[in-house]
């Protein structure tokens, strides 16, 4: 196998591939035109975050079998285009976890003790001991937003500094947090109770602007804010105003809304803002780890062995691939619906495969369901390979069973998801390549889960659906389809309504819908 290393990775990773018989060529710093010209020669390519492997590059890569991203985020790779070409995309989750966690702690200490400012002062020939009075972290309360891999390691290190640690993560169990003596609280409690707030969530549609003007107003006076996750999660304009108003005593940032930040960014002009140029993962150890993780997967691919960190394709017997793929899609869609509807820490997942489906290797059906459950909160950090280990990490109980025969259908997939005392049931099947959800809880629905859906419970009485239609019409939202399921044959109970809309509703419209007479709840999910 011929491998193109398009961005710097560790020499150890390059040597490992060569020792395993791969022909490796290192060509860093290529222009886009050079990459398109060179890539047809290779069966594997390794990139980091700068090289864009988009549809045009993939189209040019006639012989490409695998794309390795030496890092976690895959925003620079067109996953759909790669999948359509049968190209496996692998990344390196966890390879830079410790480095990122340590950097967050370093930023926290630097802000608390004003280390960069004091360093600059001494180098200017000054001796301003009183000016740089700091605070101890011992005994203070750290608020960790996001208790995934990095957040978990940050919380452990805060405990080692003898801090009290609160965490907000609606998708992590209380038992998981208690393993390291961390108390799970709601978002507002964390904001109001923390002396230091550190952010460790991925950048998704839901987390952009997670900490804005309203959230700063709920914080303690004199709070320290640290962001070593992704730019845009902390609203920079709101942060600037909070610092100027004295609400925030100091901030420490490794990531920015625009990178590199503009020299005119007002945060860069504040003396109590510590900044670094997105280097949380830039350690020798992290680069060795991510390089080796990618190198091992490329070697496995060359030897015909399973890869460990595939982002896009599971390992399924070629003869079963066409039959299984729609069920993987169905399971993932079910997971997304359950995640959005339940909206809390998942405790238990049960999967039952019946009929012809039960005769296949259904391991990836469960993994696809878990991927769907986690995707709304973990974004590109989750894939079919990592989904099950992440579930185990989070203390989720997984039960899998098979039933040989089933009535009415060739195959049936049933899932039960439990969260904070609530349970959701979904059942579905596939007809060729078409996947359909047949039942949600006690409601018969039968629909194709694809597009923008609003799922709502409402009282079964005249006028409710009409009021929803009026609201949507007033807000120029077109309803493309509607399914209403009753819990029984008689009117007067509770109905489940599925609305397929052409465009996603704004949060304001969704909130207004929940206030309509007869509406019990409403959630939006993109399927």
Curated annotation (Swiss-Prot):
Native species: Archaeoglobus fulgidus (strain ATCC 49558 / DSM 4304 / JCM 9628 / NBRC 100126 / VC-16)
Metal-binding found in the keyword field: no
One GO process term, biological-process aspect: L-serine biosynthetic process
Sorted UniProt keywords: Amino-acid biosynthesis, NAD, Oxidoreductase, Serine biosynthesis
Sequence positions that bind NAD(+): 149-150, 169, 228-230, 254, 278-281
Presence of keyword NAD: yes
Gene3D superfamilies (UniProt xref): 3.30.70.260, D-3-phosphoglycerate dehydrogenase, domain 3, NAD(P)-binding Rossmann-like Domain
Stated name of the protein: D-3-phosphoglycerate dehydrogenase
Family: Belongs to the D-isomer specific 2-hydroxyacid dehydrogenase family.
E.C. code: 1.1.1.95
Active site, UniProt feature: 230, 259, 278
Catalytic activity: (2R)-3-phosphoglycerate + NAD(+) = 3-phosphooxypyruvate + NADH + H(+)
Domain ACT: 453-527
Metabolic or biological pathway: Amino-acid biosynthesis; L-serine biosynthesis; L-serine from 3-phospho-D-glycerate: step 1/3
GO molecular function, one term: NAD binding
């Amino acid at each position: 196998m011929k491998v193109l290393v398009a961005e710097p990775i560790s020499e150890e990773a390059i040597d490992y591939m060569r020792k395993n018989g791969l022909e490796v060529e290192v060509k860093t710093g290529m222009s886009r035109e050079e990459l398109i010209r060179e890539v047809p020669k290779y069966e594997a390519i390794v990139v980091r975050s700068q090289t864009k492997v988009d549809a045009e590059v993939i189209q040019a890569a006639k012989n490409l079998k695998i794309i390795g991203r030496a890092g976690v985020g895959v925003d620079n790779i067109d996953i759909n285009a790669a999948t359509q070409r049968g190209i496996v995309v692998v990344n390196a989750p966890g390879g830079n976890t410790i480095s990122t966690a340590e950097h967050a702690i370093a930023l926290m200490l630097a802000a608390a003790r004003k280390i960069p400012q004091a360093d600059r002062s001494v180098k200017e020939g000054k001796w301003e001991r009183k000016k740089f009075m700091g605070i101890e972290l011992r005994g203070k309360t750290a608020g960790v937003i996001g208790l995934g891999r990095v957040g978990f390691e940050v919380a452990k290190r805060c405990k080692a500094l003898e801090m009290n640690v609160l965490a907000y993560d609606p998708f992590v169990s209380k038992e998981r947090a208690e393993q390291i003596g961390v108390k799970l609280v709601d978002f507002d409690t964390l904001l109001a109770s923390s002396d230091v707030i550190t952010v460790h969530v991925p950048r998704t549609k839901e987390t952009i602007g997670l900490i804005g003007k309203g959230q700063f107003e709920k914080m303690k006076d004199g709070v320290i804010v640290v962001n070593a996750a992704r730019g845009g999660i902390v609203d920079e304009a709101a942060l600037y105003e909070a610092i100027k108003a004295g609400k925030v005593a100091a901030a420490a940032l490794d990531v920015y809304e625009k990178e590199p930040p503009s020299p005119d960014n007002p945060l860069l002009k504040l003396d109590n803002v510590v900044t670094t140029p997105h280097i949380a993962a830039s350690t020798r150890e992290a680069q060795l780890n991510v390089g080796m993780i990618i190198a091992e997967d490329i070697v496995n691919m060359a030897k015909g062995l399973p890869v460990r960190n595939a982002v896009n394709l599971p390992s399924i017997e070629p003869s079963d691939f066409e039959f299984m793929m729609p069920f993987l899609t169905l399971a993932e869609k079910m997971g997304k619906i359950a995640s959005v509807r339940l909206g809390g820490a998942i405790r238990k997942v049960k999967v039952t495969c019946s009929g012809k489906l039960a005769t296949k290797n259904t391991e990836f059906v469960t993994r696809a369901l878990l991927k769907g459950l986690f995707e709304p909160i973990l974004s590109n950090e989750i894939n079919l390979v990592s989904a099950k280990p992440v579930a185990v990490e989070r203390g989720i109980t997984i039960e899998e069973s098979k039933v040989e025969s089933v009535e009415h259908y060739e195959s049936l997939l049933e899932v039960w998801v439990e969260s904070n005392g609530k349970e959701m049931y979904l059942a579905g099947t596939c007809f060729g390549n078409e996947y359909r959800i047949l039942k949600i809880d006690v409601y018969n629905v039968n629909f194709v889960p694809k597009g923008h859906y609003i799922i709502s419970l409402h009282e079964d009485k005249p006028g409710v659906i009409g009021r929803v239609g009026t609201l949507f019409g007033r807000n120029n939202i077109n309803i493309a389809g509607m399914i209403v399921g009753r819990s029984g044959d008689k009117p007067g109970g509770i109905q489940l309504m599925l609305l397929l809309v052409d465009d996603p509703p704004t949060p304001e419209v969704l909130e207004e819908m929940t206030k309509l007479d007869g509406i019990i709840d409403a959630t939006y999910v993109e399927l």
